[in-house]
Design a protein with these regions (language model features):
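Short Lys/Arg-rich cationic patches that frequently serve as NLS/NoLS or arginine-rich RNA/DNA-binding motifs
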Residues: 1-8
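Catalytic zinc-binding patch centered on the HExxH motif and its immediate surroundings
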Residues: 10-47
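Short, flexible active-site-adjacent loop segments at beta-strand->alpha-helix junctions, enriched
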Residues: 24, 52, 89
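Low-complexity, intrinsically disordered short peptide segments enriched in small/polar/basic residues
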Residues: 24-27, 63, 80
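Short pre-active-site segment immediately N-terminal to the catalytic Zn-binding motif
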Residues: 41-61, 75
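Active-site recognition of the HExxH zinc-binding catalytic motif
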Residues: 59-71
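Post-HExxH zinc-binding segment in Zn-dependent metallohydrolases
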Residues: 73-100
């Protein structure tokens, strides 16, 4: 059985929840998740595989955040190359912003 837990103990980069267009999205760390991350627009949940290193976890969060934004905008067919590139740029921006 896969258990899910709300993200509480990871770096503050990753929120436990956030809002897009009036909907609350919940971020959960999921042990043994087959993929690194998953974005579910039906339940407004982002699942991230628990146990990855911080760099992989943060990059996965930003990748899944891009999916959440695209779903919120009504886009259902996501180009993974575009999502990965945009997610990596957001992650880089966030890390650079923290150092300023």
């Amino acid at each position: 059985m896969v258990t899910k837990k709300a993200r509480r103990d990871m770096d503050s980069t990753i929120p436990s929840s956030f809002h897009l267009a009036g909907c609350e999205w919940v971020v959960m760390m999921v042990p043994e998740l087959p993929d690194m991350g998953l974005c579910n627009p039906s339940t407004y949940e982002i699942h991230i595989r628990d146990g990855m290193n911080e760099q992989a976890t943060v990059a996965t969060f930003f990748h899944e955040l891009v999916h959440a934004v695209k779903f919120t905008m009504g886009e259902t067919g996501h180009d993974e190359k575009e999502v990965e590139g945009f997610g990596n740029l957001l992650c880089q921006w966030y890390k650079t912003r923290q150092k300023l």
